[in-house]
Amino acid sequence: MSNQEYTFQTEINQLLDLMIHSLYSNKEIFLRELISNASDALDKLNYLMLTDEKLKGLNITPSIHLSFDSQKKTLTIKDNGIGMDKNDLIEHLGTIAKSGTKSFLSALSGDKKKDSALIGQFGVGFYSAFMVASKIVVQTKKVTNHQAYAWVSDGKGKFEISECVKEEQGTEITLFLKEEDSHFASRWEIDGIVKKYSEHIPFPIFLTYTDTKFEGEGDHKKEVKEEKCDQINQASALWKMNKSELKDKDYKDFYQSFAHDNSEPLSYIHNKVEGSLEYTTLFYIPSKAPFDMFRVDYKSGVKLYVKRVFITDDDKELLPSYLRFVKGVIDSEDLPLNVSREILQQNKILANIRSASVKKILSEIERLSKDEKNYHKFYEPFGKVLKEGLYGDFENKEKLLELLRFYSKDKEKLISLKEYRENLKENQKSIYYLLGENLDLLKASPLLEKYAQKGYDVLLLSDEIDAFVMPGVNEYDKTPFRDASHSESLKELGLEEINDEVKDQFKDLMKAFEENLKDEIKGVELSSHLTSAVALIGDEQNAMMANFMRQMGQSVPESKKTLELNPNHAILQKLLKCEDKEQLSAFIWLLYDGAKLLEKGALKDAKSFNERLNSVLLKAL
């Protein structure tokens, strides 16, 4: 087969241009990324050797080998893992399908240090090698194939693939280093980077180098060169080590390598269980949210091992989805080595490990919450996703409620339900909350006025997830939750109903509202729960459905709602006496527009609103 030339996808070209010209603040991470990829390839081969009958007789010692040539300015990374075939090369090294490149590009901030830290997190680590290499040659042979392939590119828009000769399965990557980056072809440079980032990769990393020493003395002294191959990492599964042997730095270094994250984690939980079940877990709570946390196709941050043998890193059942920001390892002594994904989903051992792990993680979050000043470092990135647990994790619902924080009518900061509960007024029967699209609109809601008169605080919930989960939350500490917009809640305020005399007094004016706004609203009602506001747009059933649809990612169709009027307001009292139909119509529309502004913060037809306002002002002056 002759060389076949391919063109990188557009996004890959953009990425390569960034790698080569912009993201150079921490170039050494390229080696961390290539070693991590090699480790993944070894993990995958180990798993296949357990599950694929054709490969069970394969006898290999998994390892990663590094070598360099300082004269030729080359650096080579070699593994004997699963390898790639031609299609894998095109898919993984030429297209966006597996790389997360589009998400990476959209997440760039312009800060070179921060942006370079994103490289591994977004699965685009291979391309980081172009920060230091003018050309890359990949030779690879898939374990299930007889034919090996070579991939060659200078990172300038194209790559070539051809057949090649390679006896052993696995992948060998050779970097032709740029002049200014030739220092990476050095024993001590490579050794230092591996010890910094890859000390606890669970496979041995060997470095081949030429050792120079002198023998003899005086005129008989001569230089002797000897090729050596040393293991330069511990190759120890850090999670299997005793906690007493490990320092805080060990945990943090492992996290940065494992999670491809240059920042330090907020916290970690290392736990070893012995007894009827034996397993070890090491979980990390990151300091920033994974880029794909709110995507349906988010990648699990937890790897499952059985007796140190990698099983999967793509099982979203290892932890509940509301803890998908957690990174870490579960290593079981009791699961069968050839466990399939289908068996995993029904396995009682794993279910027990999962249940205990969730409790451990929530307990750690509870520990973080004891320091409210620092708790925001956790809650700001992860509070929204934590709320999802209220919908499905009934076993831990009470614990989750303790961990959640909310804005409220009376407080300028996030508060806990415990704090709200401690400040209940003497006759207050419920915990009140109000759902809306954003915090500013909620704070301005006329619905809050009567609660304020009673001295009742109201939780203001503007996250989309709130509308999805709150209807399923019945109580906290024996105090029921109530939506502040619902009629049931308003009854608890002890409001008097509008009497027939007032209804009769406003009958003609309400008819005028209905005639003018017949295409906009489904009806007009007099309300006893408004104080300073003239009008309010309300419809509790439609509001619940709209919030639910937003949470499900669906567009919310326009629907007619009820316009509630405050019969005690001076403006409405004056409108009762307005006999100019044209002017009355203008007033009605202005009041409706005002109510829409309070509801949405914007108007669909701002031009007409402005014309009506000008007309009324002109007549008033």
Swiss-Prot record:
Subunit text: Homodimer.
Region B: start-end pairs: 342-547
Record has Iron-sulfur as a keyword: no
Residue span of region C: 548-621
Residue ranges of the region described as A: 1-341
InterPro entries according to UniProt: HATPase_C_sf, Heat_shock_protein_90_CS, HSP90_C, Hsp90_fam, Hsp90_N, Ribosomal_Su5_D2-typ_SF
Family matches, as CDD domains: HATPase_Hsp90-like
Pfam families reported in the protein's UniProt record: HATPase_c_3, HSP90
Chaperone keyword on record: yes
Record's function text: Molecular chaperone. Has ATPase activity.
Protein name (Swiss-Prot/TrEMBL): Chaperone protein HtpG
GO molecular function annotation: ATP binding; ATP hydrolysis activity; ATP-dependent protein folding chaperone; unfolded protein binding
Subcellular location: Cytoplasm
HAMAP family in the cross-refs: HSP90 (MF_00505)
Family of the protein in this entry: Belongs to the heat shock protein 90 family.
A single GO cellular-component term on record: cytoplasm
Organism the protein comes from: Helicobacter pylori (strain HPAG1)
